[in-house]
Amino acid sequence: MSRTESREHAIQILFQIENEAHEISVEDATRFIVEPPNRDVFADELVHGVISKQNELDDKITPHLKSWALERLNKIDRIILRLSAFELLYTDAPEKVIVNEAVNLAKKFSDDESYKFINGVLSEIIKNKA
């Protein structure tokens, strides 16, 4: 399974978790996206990383939203930003790859203009990362 597919799975799993009116476990959400007995280890790492670091990620994202509140963003954009910020801050994946993947995820799962916004926010996070 490619990392691109894994990122898509992670986005879908995180969306499922955030979209449920009742509590749903990561395992149950994953079963909706990745059919057992298959397993997507990279998606699992991303999902657990985003969930465990969510408050820190939100703190890193929020200053770059320019007159927006994180909770006012549509869910998929918020999830793409969290996932990408997690990769930027806590993995050794190349920054250009992460931003490119985020832009592609936004083009695939969000509205027509979201990718520009996401690209801008991630660029600011990179500038202020050090």
Swiss-Prot record:
Pfam family, one: NusB
GO BP term, pick one: transcription antitermination
Record-level GO cellular component terms: cytosol
InterPro entries (UniProt xref): NusB-like_sf, NusB_fam, NusB_RsmB_TIM44
One annotated GO molecular function: RNA binding
Keywords noted in UniProt: RNA-binding, Transcription, Transcription antitermination, Transcription regulation
Domain of life assignment: Bacteria
Function: Involved in transcription antitermination. Required for transcription of ribosomal RNA (rRNA) genes. Binds specifically to the boxA antiterminator sequence of the ribosomal RNA (rrn) operons.
Family as reported in the entry's similarity comment: Belongs to the NusB family.
Protein name: Transcription antitermination protein NusB
Organism: Macrococcus caseolyticus (strain JCSC5402) (Macrococcoides caseolyticum)
